[in-house]
Amino acid sequence: MSSNFIRRAVCSACVAALFAAGAAAAPAAPRVLPGTMPADIAAALERVRLPRDALVAVVQEVGDASPRWTWRADTPANPASLMKLLTTFAALDLLGPAWTWTTPVWLHGSVAGGVLDGDLVIKGSGDPKLVMERVWLLLRRVQQLGVREIYGDIVLDRSAFSAPNLTQTQTQTQTQTPTPTPADFDAEPLRPYNVRADALLLNYQSLVFTLLPDPARGVALVSVDPPLAGLRVTPSVPLGAGPCADWRAALKADFSDPDAPKFAGTYALGCAEKSWPIAYAEPKNYAARVLSGIWQQLGGRLTGTVRDGSAPATPPTFVATSPALADVVRDTNKFSNNVMAQQLFLTLALTQRGSGSAELAREVLADWAQARLGSAASGLVIDNGSGLSRETRLSANLLAQLLQRAWSSPVMPELMSSLPVSGVDGTLKRSRATLGRAHLKTGSLRDVSGVAGYVLGDSGRRYVVVAIVNHPNAAAARPALFDALVQWAANDAELARLAP
């Protein structure tokens, strides 16, 4: 066992011990009788018109075998983005916080006089953070190696992840199944949360339109990043009178032509600079157009095309390295980034089974959950690792045991610091509950809402808190119900008041 791992384990144990020591003098909060519900939580459910059987929940002190309160804790529920806790903890546990993705690059040919007589080959391995700045640096590195003109093609190797439409049924029957598209989940293909995983995922396959008012000219200037080759954008829109209300609707955007997005409306004079991220309408062509666009922006020339292909068997000319896994996990959980979670999910299959398929990723995650959580993992249904699914199922007890396990693990600091902090950042920035004292992952879909993480009590004790609502009115649970639950967990110095 490495000395670094031992130091990390000792450090994590010390942190946990300090938390425990700080709470040692405080009496344990009273436990709620089985089958009863704290009055504050019952009242919150009634206020938002949610039935009690829509909720599954656990509140449990860290390190304590007995929960302070449970409600239908073993009932399987759709967790929405709370599923990311399972994926990110498994990734940290199996790969380590310092693990990185590598993107090898080949100058496959001879270089002379600023010309590469051959192909530029880039092989993806699932890096979730090949954002515009890093793509720019990658191509700048190519130029630093003496290449200004590519007398050949830019070849993209995406083979690390298996094609999602090749199913066992299709192989057996030889019938064609529809290729999954970003519109499949909720018919909103331009929403960035619907972007699909890709072994060579560039800039989350998204565009960001920026609108900057210029009152002197009576227009708002429109710009777009990253630069896509061949993309034609309306350079400005007229300024309109009035306050900045639903500015997106007022723009009357038309994204039906991926090559020429249009804005037929106006932009309110009362609006400051605004950004509008969208998923690119033709994801299969996105990488090619981004690479062509940035290469041209750098002054480079390409005589051939950008196409898919295979990387050479020879060692690469250089390798681009991603940020550490801990940084990726932080972005994934703080901002509930679906495509980053799916990249992690398939990376687990690639690293643990040698092939980046969804089937193998489900196998890896299920095996890991069984090994770490035992019987609590029963009833677990895994789909894509992000929670953007109607099929995923797990229990509140599973998430509670997962968080207990994480608390005592060497990667506890990385996982906990990746969670949004109440009233401070991420998806909890607007939360009004226990400012700065709750680290909670949030989750929401149509008919689903949930929170799971850690809450610091008034006594100095820390609690695992899990709550999921599955109901057509689930959206009403945030913030009223979850704020009430978090506040109740934090108020552990008071006697529990039970609902009748």
Short names for language-model regions:
Residues 2-13:
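Bacterial N-terminal signal peptides that target proteins for export
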Residues 11-21:
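Bacterial N-terminal signal peptides
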Residues 26-45, 94-377, 491-494, 498:
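Conserved serine DD-peptidase/penicillin-binding transpeptidase domain
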Residues 46-71, 307:
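A short, well-structured edge-of-sheet supersecondary motif
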Residues 57-60, 103-105, 452:
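Short beta-strand scaffold segments in enzyme catalytic cores
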Residues 65, 84-91, 154, 200, ...:
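Residue-level preference for non-acidic, small/hydrophobic
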Residues 68-70, 345-500:
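Small-residue-rich helix-loop
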Residues 70-90, 94-95:
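Short active-site loop at a secondary-structure junction
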